[in-house]
């Protein structure tokens, strides 16, 4: 069904190529990595376009309670670091995924090939496993896909081919 959304409905634009691999995690659940290469006319060339597709913030629960609950359920990293030094993502006293991320008032290009998503310091906090967390802990997601599939779907935009 995800392939239908991406390849047939082309929710992110016309697709030139799609490559994916399905892995099985330690506990037997399927886990997919999928790379979409968009055609020239559909490429996301600036941070304003990134923000139309990817979000890395907690939705306002008064405006969209359902989406907020899905983000809390599926798209919060950890907690790790000082909040949980025993988290599986910890390597040498640091999170291997670099959480918590820095606050940022806008989306921009990162030093590597990933975008740095808007994570505003808006004072909004949520409670997850006895910890108060904010936008620094939100994994990038697409609101439409998160609501449609009700599961963890980490969505990242690469601005170069350095990682491929």
Residue ranges: model-predicted function:
Residues 1-164:
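Extended, structured polyanion-binding interfaces
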